[in-house]
Amino acid sequence: MALNIKDPEVDRLAAELADRLHTSKTAAIRHALSAQLAFLESRAGDREAQLLDILRTEIWPLLADRSPITKLEREQILGYDPATGV
């Protein structure tokens, strides 16, 4: 499957990366895309851990019994009506 790069700046960046990696543009683009996907995947896990940490340290201690609220309690707070779905 072919990839046709029409943007001169993207072509220049691909050429520069290929030159620095001593490889072809195709290999450089593959490397860059794989690295970006790995970075995004690693951040997704970090984000989940950060959110749980905030819940543990900032939110849950404010609750009377120090436990997370239930789904039903969340729905009541938001005014959600399960019968209508709104």
From Swiss-Prot:
Tell me the InterPro entries matching this sequence: VapB-like
Q: Which Pfam families match?
A: PSK_trans_fac
Q: Which domain of life is it from?
A: Bacteria
Keywords of the record, alphabetical order, are: Toxin-antitoxin system
Q: What does this protein do?
A: Possibly the antitoxin component of a type II toxin-antitoxin (TA) system. Its cognate toxin is VapC36 (Potential).
Name by which UniProt lists this protein: Putative antitoxin VapB36
Source organism of the structure: Mycobacterium tuberculosis (strain CDC 1551 / Oshkosh)
